[in-house]
Swiss-Prot record:
Coiled-coil intervals: 294-328
Chain positions recorded as Zn(2+) binding sites: C154, C157, C178, C181
Cofactor: Zn(2+)
Keywords, ordered alphabetically: Coiled coil, Cytoplasm, Metal-binding, NAD, Nucleus, Repressor, Transcription, Transcription regulation, Transferase, Zinc
PROSITE patterns in the record: SIRTUIN (PS50305)
Pfam families, per the entry: SIR2
Protein name: NAD-dependent protein deacetylase hst2-1
Family annotation (CDD domains): SIRT1
Any one GO biological process: rDNA heterochromatin formation
Length: 361
């Protein structure tokens, strides 16, 4: 396992378990088997409809704005060594990334529906936005491969830091310090120079026991997350819900490709299962701001306008907060040249590995 063909299965090759490689056949399989051990694997695409800024945009994204600030390198904001030297840039940015201002998507609610029906074995995510938790999926059902904002601790003595104090610090753009040793506090998200959570490796082979695998909104280009679908046993259906085919999905007789955005894809599957009304109700209940769909549609500002305002405020805040002297910049650049940041293209441990939204196109 871990290596499989990327060649699309011949259309003439019949499925071994499903009646056909269709959404309807998957729904029939789920209901008749019956399926009880679904493993879900997701990436940044599952959160697109939540309105989270597209950090990758070359002209308007947050990443593009960081490029023009007085940083030795935009990626330094997410480097643990740089964070130790100057945590202010990260906390200026954290307000845009922290949970609470974005609502779960229909795809997140679909995962919750799987859990409610007793069918979810485990949910693997590359995202740090905690939207699965906001949708109601219990934390013990989630493997956050790149960590998340759900918890935080001191980077020195590892003492946990209270949630309420962390939320207050992020809201104010302040840097929190440990009450025990005065060390810097950081959310439990994976920075450059840090290992992935042990929970990921402890559960990495869990897909071997699945009776259905659903992959959504990920390019499957970053290891070790990208290898997860290959652990699914032959003969177990794998469903890809994504705008394009990725990884080795589609190479097995029982792989089903739903090439669409994640929300449309889960709606199609829910409709075939007879779950559409339940899914819509769960999604409505998952709105932390308790706005109706009509109210959301009536909101006068477009997503682009909201994003532009958010980026302008963020850039101004970081520009005001971050005042790195020329001498300090020189020292940091020299340190980074001596200890180069990992490259996403070279070994999969770079920015895309930690923050999928920030990956360069």
């Amino acid at each position: 396992m871990g290596n499989e063909s990327s060649t699309l299965v011949d259309e003439k090759t019949p499925p071994s378990v499903l009646e056909a490689r269709t959404v309807e056949a998957v729904a029939k399989y789920v209901k008749e088997k019956p399926v009880r051990r679904v493993v879900v694997m997701v990436g940044a695409g599952i959160s697109t409809a939540a309105g989270i800024p597209d950090f990758r945009s070359p002209d308007t994204g947050i990443y593009a704005n960081l490029v023009h600030l007085d940083l030795p390198d935009p990626e330094a904001v997410f480097d643990i060594s740089f964070f130790r030297q100057n945590p202010k840039p990260f906390y200026a940015l954290a307000r845009e990334l922290a949970p609470g201002q974005y609502r779960p998507t229909l795809a997140h609610s679909f995962v919750k529906l799987l859990y409610d029906k007793g069918k979810l074995l485990k949910h693997f995510t590359q995202n740090i936005d905690c939207l699965e938790r906001l949708a109601g999926v219990p934390g013990d059902m989630i493997i956050e491969a790149h960590g998340s904002f759900a918890t935080q601790r001191c980077i020195e003595c590892k003492t946990a830091y209270p949630d309420d104090l962390m939320k207050e610090a992020i809201a104010k753009g302040e840097v929190p310090n440990c009450a025990e040793c005065q060390g810097l506090v950081k959310p439990d998200i994976v920075f450059f120079g840090e290992a992935l959570p042990s929970a990921f490796f402890d559960n990495r082979t869990l897909p071997e026991t699945a009776d259905l695998c659903i992959v959504m909104g990920t390019s499957l280009s970053v290891q070790p997350f990208a290898s997860l679908p290959s652990f699914v046993a032959d003969g177990v259906p794998r469903v890809l819900i994504n705008r394009e085919r990725v990884g080795g999905l589609g190479s097995r007789p029982d792989d089903v490709l739903i090439l669409d955005d994640c929300d449309n894809g889960v709606r199609k599957l829910a409709r075939a299962l007879g779950w559409e009304d339940e899914l819509e109700r769960l999604w409505e209940e998952a709105n932390p701001n308790q706005k109706s769909r009509e109210e959301e549609l009536a909101t006068p500002r477009t997503r682009e306008e909201r994003l532009e305002n958010e980026i302008s405020r963020l850039t101004a805040e970081i520009d005001k907060t971050l005042k790195i002297s020329d001498a300090y910049q020189k020292r940091v650049r020299e340190r980074l040249e001596g200890e180069p940041l990992s490259s996403p293209e070279s070994n999969g441990t770079g920015l895309a590995h930690v923050f999928p939204h920030l990956a360069r196109r």
